[in-house]
Structure formats: structure tokens, C-alpha cells
């Protein structure tokens, strides 16, 4: 199988999984034009669309794609039912498309009904996790997002995380400001700066690496706890997660 990212808008990525027969699955098509262009250039035959949440920069291209390819099944959470979804899915369900079986995880936080799709080794996480960071909490709570991160962190370390936005540079600048002495964070921040200076993508990423550089996965890390303790005493990892999210919101 082939994993392809299609840039959209200013910093979105629309993900495509294609098999050796050029059949493909499209994830979070926020706009149709770049997807239709890629379909024509690669000779793909779209079979299905996966939606992680209802925001327009993830669903805006669905009507045009379904008009062009009327056979498309569109899988998404309840909150996308009025965005073109033909099959509503939720936590614990499995979706079989071609040779891929996608497990569905409920990951509330960014939105209340956000979901992720996992088909080893790929995780399509929408706006739940970004490299070095996490999604803004528009509808959910820090506690919900913390639990969503625990689900992702329970996946195998070789999981390939397909985030929906190129936010890595800003996230690593924030992480480096929190733990300026952390070698893994500083090294990755330097690597990301080099990639973005060349206008190269930083995605996808591997869960094993995220565990080292993503502070939102390190809420039990002693260095982070000591940093937070300089300002306030927080006993629970959910509280430290909320502290990080608040700091990032105001960074």
C-alpha cells in the first residue's frame, strides 16, 4: 500500500491510502480540487472517504467528490452526519475497506465527537494529535483529550501517525520553551526547522518518536513535573495536561 499526503489550504494534509490496483481511501478531504487533481494524475479509483470530525477544513470537499464518484461510502462520527457521511461509526467498530480493516477510536477533545481510524501501522488522527502537540479544545475538556491521548499512546510504538496539519514547527518551539535543556526536544526542533526552511513536510511521524518529544505524551515525566512545580503543584497527569494546553493556548 502507498500512503500519500495532499497539501490543502494553508497547512492541512489530506491523506490517501492507495493499494497496488490504484484503489484508494481518502481521509478528511477539506477541499476537493487538490484531491481530484491527484486522482487524475495517479489514476486512482476512490472507494471510500473517512472523516474524523465535522470541521469544514476536513469535510468541505465531500460533496464535490461524491458528485464525481457517486459510489463512494463516507464513514464518520455522528457529528458528520449532515456533512455527507453515509455510514456513522463510533468507538469499538471496525470498518473493512478493500484489504484494510480500520478500528475506530472515540477521541473527544478537539470536538466532542472526534474519532480516529487505525489500520496497522497507520493512525489517522485528524486534529487530536499533532507532531509535538495536541489539538485545540473547541468542544471537549482537557481531561477528555488526555484520555484520548492515552488511547493513542497504547498503540504499538511503530505506529505511523498521520496528523491533519503542519503545526510541528510551532509545537516544537513551544516544547523547547518549556524544557530548553531536553536533548530530544532540541534535536527534533532543529531538524524540523531545517525541513520547514526547505518547505518540506514533517509528517507523518512515528509514535516512538512522539513519546520522546511530545510533552502531551510526557505528563508523568519528571523533568516536566519539576518544571510545572516551579509554578504550581499538580498531582494528576490530567491536570498537567491541562496546564500544558493552557500554556500553549497563550504561547
UniProtKB/Swiss-Prot annotation:
Q: Pfam families, from UniProt?
A: HAGH_C, Lactamase_B
Q: Which InterPro entries match?
A: Clx_II_MBL (IPR035680), Glyoxalase_II_hydrolase (IPR050110), HAGH_C (IPR032282), Hydroxyacylglutathione_Hdrlase (IPR017782), Metallo-B-lactamas (IPR001279), RibonucZ/Hydroxyglut_hydro (IPR036866)
Highest taxon listed in the record's lineage = Bacteria
Biological processes annotated in GO: methylglyoxal catabolic process to D-lactate via S-lactoyl-glutathione
Question: So what EC number does this one have?
Answer: 3.1.2.6
Residues at which Zn(2+) 2 binds: 57-58, 127, 165
Q: Which residues bind Zn(2+) 1?
A: 53, 55, 110, 127
Q: How is the cofactor bound?
A: Binds 2 Zn(2+) ions per subunit.
- UniProt-recorded Gene Ontology molecular function terms: hydroxyacylglutathione hydrolase activity; metal ion binding
Functional description taken from the UniProt entry: Thiolesterase that catalyzes the hydrolysis of S-D-lactoyl-glutathione to form glutathione and D-lactic acid.
Show the HAMAP family listed in the entry: Glyoxalase_2
Q: What name does UniProt use for this protein?
A: Hydroxyacylglutathione hydrolase
- Species, as recorded: Enterobacter sp. (strain 638)
Q: What is the lineage of its organism?
A: Bacteria, Pseudomonadati, Pseudomonadota, Gammaproteobacteria, Enterobacterales
Q: Supply the gene name.
A: gloB
